[in-house]
Structures are given as structure tokens and as C-alpha cells.
């Protein structure tokens, strides 16, 4: 359904992005940020799901600045490699790539951002720093409590799992206390409840979070 295109960030860096064009009535543009494993088939599936609902979706290859076409599996060795790459990528450079995606989509209408795990953390920072966003929805971003100094500049929603060992409920409460204006939802689920890993996936939590996300988009993505 989708294709890979190349975009150029403000600093001249050229990167790949998976593009899934909307089906049916157009609802706006959506930047979807990868998990720490790269723009994997699972991430492309998520892009396609949102495209089927009417969104033009772009998912930037955040790691292209360090390693082109980087994609990792779920075993411990692969996780360690992906964590190292995320650390090398930092924050400033990914924000430039995300801004380029927003600018590309913005010519056609309102743009939102969503992301999962590593991408959920980048969504939080993007909500504060990226220009032109109508709203932001982050899923189980583990690093959000470390970046509470970032002030979202657009309406922001966050989703977490109550049984997420990497994001204890005390961390979720910390976010609530620091940013009471943010719309936070907690589901009876593990970390990565939208992922394709059977031990993490929750059909019920994914569906409930999606319904809230789509309602949030409908409210805030006004041309």
C-alpha cells in the first residue's frame, strides 16, 4: 500500500520516510514515529491502518543519520543495538526530520503526530518543539518523565499500560502532576500493547486507545 520516499531536513540531511496515502475521505496528515526497532513491517502496518482511516501518513527513518535502513529484531542483542543507535541519534536531529515531515504534509491540511515507545517519547518533545502540529498523541513513551521541562505547544494525549514494567504508574503520576493539561489514559496492558509481539499485544487496549486517539484527532485537526 505504501512507498518509501526521500525527504530533506533543514540541515540538508536526506532521509527515507514510509508514506501511506489516505483511503476514502481525507482527514489530514499524520507523522507516525517508529519504535526503537526502526521503520519495521509492524510500523508500516500501523501507517497503513491510519491511512485506511483517511490520513496521509509519513514515518521517518529516524536512524538514517547514523545507519541507513536500520531495522532490528526483538532479541536482547538487537535491542541493545537499537538502544545504542537511539542514544547516538540524540534529540535535536530527529526533531529536524520530524519537522520536515510536518512541512511536507502541511501543504494539504492539518497535521498530527503519533508514535510508539521510543517514538512516544519523541512525540512528547515534538509537541513542544515542532511547528505546525494540530495535536500530538504518544504511546508509552518511557523517556517522557525525563523531559517534563518540555511544554507542549499543541493539545497532547498520552497512552500507557498499567502493567508496563518500564513505565511504573508512579512515573505516569509524575507526568500528570507536572502537566495537568495533558490528556492521559492508562489501560490494563503491558508496555507495547499496540506492538506485534504476542507477549505485549493487547487487542482491547489497542482498540480503546485508538478510539480515543481518533476522537482527539477529530477534535483538533481543524483546517
For each feature predicted by the language model, list its residue ranges:
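N-terminal cap/leader regions of alpha/beta-hydrolase-fold enzymes
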Residues: 1-223
Amino acid at each position: 500500500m505504501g512507498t518509501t520516499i526521500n525527504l530533506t531536513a533543514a540541515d540538508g540531511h536526506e532521509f527515507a520516510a514510509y508514506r501511506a496515502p489516505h483511503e476514502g475521505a481525507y482527514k489530514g496528515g499524520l507523522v507516525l514515529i517508529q519504535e526503537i526497532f526502526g521503520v519495521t513491517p509492524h510500523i508500516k502496518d500501523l501507517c497503513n491502518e491510519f491511512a485506511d482511516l483517511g490520513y496521509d501518513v509519513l514515518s521517518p527513518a529516524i536512524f538514517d543519520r547514523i545507519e541507513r535502513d536500520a531495522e532490528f529484531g526483538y532479541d536482547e542483542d538487537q535491542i541493545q543495538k537499537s538502544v545504542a543507535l537511539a542514544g547516538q541519534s540524540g534529540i535535536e536531529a530527529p526533531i529536524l526530520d520530524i519537522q520536515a515531515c510536518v512541512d511536507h504534509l502541511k501543504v494539504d491540511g492539518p497535521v498530527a503526530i503519533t508514535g510508539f515507545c521510543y517514538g512516544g517519547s519523541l512525540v512528547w518533545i515534538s509537541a513542544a518543539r515542532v511547528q505546525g502540529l494540530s495535536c500530538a498523541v504518544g504511546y508509552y513513551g518511557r523517556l517522557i518523565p525525563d523531559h517534563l521541562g518540555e511544554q507542549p505547544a499543541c493539545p497532547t494525549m498520552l497512552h500507557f499500560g498499567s502493567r508496563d514494567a518500564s513505565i511504573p504508574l508512579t512515573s505516569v503520576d509524575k507526568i500528570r502532576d507536572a502537566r495537568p493539561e495533558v490528556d492521559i489514559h492508562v489501560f490494563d496492558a503491558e508496555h507495547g500493547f499496540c506492538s506485534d509481539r504476542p507477549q505485549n499485544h493487547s487487542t482491547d487496549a489497542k482498540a480503546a486507545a485508538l478510539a480515543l486517539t481518533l476522537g482527539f484527532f477529530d477534535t483538533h485537526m481543524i483546517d
